């Protein structure tokens, strides 16, 4: 295979260092010129300023990330066999995890960390939910779907590429059935002994936050005979886990009544005592201040907010938001209580998040001990050359 088969993206002098370290992104500011014409999503070769071959990737002319790398192997073709290999490699790891942990649902493809930039595939039983978030992923849609069908011949595939980031790639939002039957309105899955209902068609992201699986399990270690507050509860995964861990009472708070209704169903589905579960539709910030003013106290608080920051310009505001909400939570905890707090913002580093929690404790006038650290579950791996893949971080904090 020769370079002449593909248009070439030529890097500016000195901008090849990240590629030599096998980082999969090329930003627009590092590009000197294009040699040859390439449509959005098409395969291109990436070379340094002297023409030395570096990688093969997908062209994204509308994005600040001008190209994403498919392969660093000059002899590897980007064809149907390529996508089948990537999916099979990913499935080998997930199948082992599923057998070990008794799972029927997991993230099959985690984008760059599985060698498929812009591709997310979540499995829920026999339903596979597809998100194609880059121009290259969209261009290879047919090959990706074919590879998935070859690996799982009887699967149903549903597209949830209804994510705003596609607009940055010059793509329209997309959602709907791709292969097989429509998923039911609520699909039951199994996670660490829990039965949980997932809304693939209308739920957050692909329907459920699989990345928090291990954190939900860890919650059980802290809640026996405790009063628990579950903030930003969504469909109640943390609440169900807390009840299975023997909590005395759990209050789940969310702004969505639909999500709270599913949370209630999840408690009932697991045969748990519904009298121990309270469901409150409210704004978490406002409710925490109300609880503080009323003198309410809890033994364990789960703080799992949505992403507060989408770009660097929002980071300072997000830091203030994280500090305020964690300060309020710390104020509501009994001495010896535990705060389980998380950030899913990729721009929020673990060190910065830990500093924010420390600052929140100072503002709350309480001492805090960091006793456990969390990250996304093992079906959401982070390849060493792409640290941005570590987006979810969390701490268990003992409040003195």
Swiss-Prot record:
Its EC number is 2.1.1.191. One of its GO terms (cellular component) is cytoplasm. It comes from the Bacteria. InterPro entries: PUA, PUA-like_sf, PUA_sf, RLMI, RlmI-like_PUA, SAM-dep_methyl-trfase, SAM-dependent_MTases_sf. The keyword rRNA processing applies. CDD domains: AdoMet_MTases (cd02440), PUA_RlmI (cd21153), RlmI_M_like (cd11572). Residues 6-84 form the PUA domain. SUPFAM superfamilies: PUA domain-like, S-adenosyl-L-methionine-dependent methyltransferases. Coiled coil: none annotated. The keyword S-adenosyl-L-methionine applies. Gene3D superfamilies: PUA domain (2.30.130.10), RNA methyltransferase domain (HRMD) like (3.30.750.80), Vaccinia Virus protein VP39 (3.40.50.150). Keywords: Cytoplasm, Methyltransferase, RNA-binding, rRNA processing, S-adenosyl-L-methionine, Transferase. SMART domains: PUA (SM00359). GO terms for molecular function: RNA binding; rRNA (cytosine) methyltransferase activity. Pfam families: Methyltrans_SAM, PUA_3. It catalyses: cytidine(1962) in 23S rRNA + S-adenosyl-L-methionine = 5-methylcytidine(1962) in 23S rRNA + S-adenosyl-L-homocysteine + H(+). It is found in: Cytoplasm. Specifically methylates the cytosine at position 1962 (m5C1962) of 23S rRNA. Belongs to the methyltransferase superfamily. RlmI family. This is Ribosomal RNA large subunit methyltransferase I. It comes from Klebsiella pneumoniae (strain 342). The lineage of its organism: Bacteria, Pseudomonadati, Pseudomonadota, Gammaproteobacteria, Enterobacterales.
